[in-house]
Amino acid sequence: VAASSALPTTSSGTTAGAAGAPGVPEPARQHTKAGAIAFAEHYIGLINSVGQEPKVGVLEPLALASCKSCDNFEGTIKYFVAHKQRFDGPQYKIKKSNVTGYSEIATFIRVEASEPAVSIVAASGSNVKRYPEVLKSVSIFRLDWRSGWRVVTIQGES
């Protein structure tokens, strides 16, 4: 790649035009279709990680306060922290993701995943509840760009 075709970087070393909440990986900070896909996949990855190692405040900066599905994920984590519980594995394994709509107003990402069998476990290691495997789960993310991607809604595909 010629030096003239490289994107300019800021003094912090991030690509010019990149934005987003702290901790969001570089590909998910781009205001592009690929950036939107990377952001939706990053959000699912965080759901998996905070489900297994619960920590409040990780998901909240990535979504609008009006996102009801996001509130549900955040509420589960708050409950886990308060009751010293966690998932014993990831809740989602992404199979494929693609853009289904892209405009200046909103971007829609379709994420197809499987849901492995997973248990909620107590600090003692005892099983609290077991969820069966779901082979196909499809979620439609509506993302808006507001100095970085933010989740507006997550809906199941009917």
Where do the PLM segments sit?
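Exposed beta-sheet edge and beta->alpha loop/turn motif
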Residues: 1, 101-158
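Amphipathic, hydrophobic N-terminal targeting peptides for secretion and organelle import
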Residues: 1-21
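A short, amphipathic edge element
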Residues: 82-100
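Core segments of small alpha/beta cavity-forming domains
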Residues: 16-87
